Amino acid sequence: MVHILVRKVEATNMFFSSWTLVFLAVGIIIEEWAELKLGPQKPTITHSPWICCTPLWPSDGLEVIRNILIVVLSLSFMHNLLLGFEFTYMIPQTKYTLIMTACLAFLTGILLLGALLLYHHMLRQGESVYYSSYKISWIIFTAYLNVLFLFISGFLSLLQYKQPIDGSGSLIPRSARKSQVMEQHGVSIKVVSLPAGTAMPRSIVRLHSAHMKEDSPERLNIQARRVTWAL
């Protein structure tokens, strides 16, 4: 049961990390992060923080936001790749790797939140200079949802970090590993609990193997020879 619970946490972590990458990719493709209204009789144009330093809005702060978003995309890809390697056991799932994934998730979420807040500040700052008003679109809300997903992923990694480890440093429970090995070898152990005050029997363990079955005719022949000699 513990092993199943750990695998569910890992799958949930992978789910949030994968959707973060999907929403970041959608944010790159869709350029309608904000609608900028140039004037009463002028058309409305769209703007995205991935496109900076346009003739309409020549600001160095937008280039900083773009660079932060590139770092966020790179860290999110590394985080998802590391979680995938852990989920498929391509790398050992130790406490060090879980700390690394948790730190990557929190760092990526903080950087993305800082980039979004800075973008809002730049929009308010350029409202009276380059355009008359602005309106944010739904893609910014998905970006804030990415921040929530990254923080949830970090907390899930910390939750896995609190799981006990065995001697090899892996977070797979020892009991689950033993049961898997026993199932592979076809060995089953049944534990029978005796009531209190019952005396322990001498020996109730009987071994039945293929070797004993093969040796049983030879033993019968030896016993027959002994009986014949006695007669």
From Swiss-Prot:
<keyword id="KW-0472">Membrane</keyword>
<dbReference type="InterPro" id="IPR033542">
    <property type="entry name" value="TMEM225"/>
</dbReference>
<feature type="topological domain" description="Extracellular">
    <location>
        <begin position="35"/>
        <end position="67"/>
    </location>
</feature>
<feature type="transmembrane region" description="Helical">
    <location>
        <begin position="68"/>
        <end position="88"/>
    </location>
</feature>
<protein>
    <recommendedName>
        <fullName>Transmembrane protein 225</fullName>
    </recommendedName>
</protein>
<keyword id="KW-0812">Transmembrane</keyword>
<feature type="short sequence motif" description="RVxF">
    <location>
        <begin position="225"/>
        <end position="229"/>
    </location>
</feature>
<comment type="function">
    <text>Probably inhibits protein phosphatase 1 (PP1) in sperm via binding to catalytic subunit PPP1CC.</text>
</comment>
<keyword id="KW-0968">Cytoplasmic vesicle</keyword>
<dbReference type="Pfam" id="PF25452">
    <property type="entry name" value="TM225"/>
</dbReference>
<feature type="topological domain" description="Cytoplasmic">
    <location>
        <begin position="89"/>
        <end position="97"/>
    </location>
</feature>
<feature type="transmembrane region" description="Helical">
    <location>
        <begin position="14"/>
        <end position="34"/>
    </location>
</feature>
<feature type="transmembrane region" description="Helical">
    <location>
        <begin position="136"/>
        <end position="156"/>
    </location>
</feature>
<comment type="subunit">
    <text>Interacts (via RVxF motif) with PPP1CC.</text>
</comment>
<dbReference type="GO" id="GO:0002080">
    <property type="term" value="C:acrosomal membrane"/>
</dbReference>
<feature type="topological domain" description="Cytoplasmic">
    <location>
        <begin position="1"/>
        <end position="13"/>
    </location>
</feature>
<feature type="topological domain" description="Cytoplasmic">
    <location>
        <begin position="157"/>
        <end position="231"/>
    </location>
</feature>
<keyword id="KW-1133">Transmembrane helix</keyword>
<feature type="topological domain" description="Extracellular">
    <location>
        <begin position="119"/>
        <end position="135"/>
    </location>
</feature>
<feature type="transmembrane region" description="Helical">
    <location>
        <begin position="98"/>
        <end position="118"/>
    </location>
</feature>
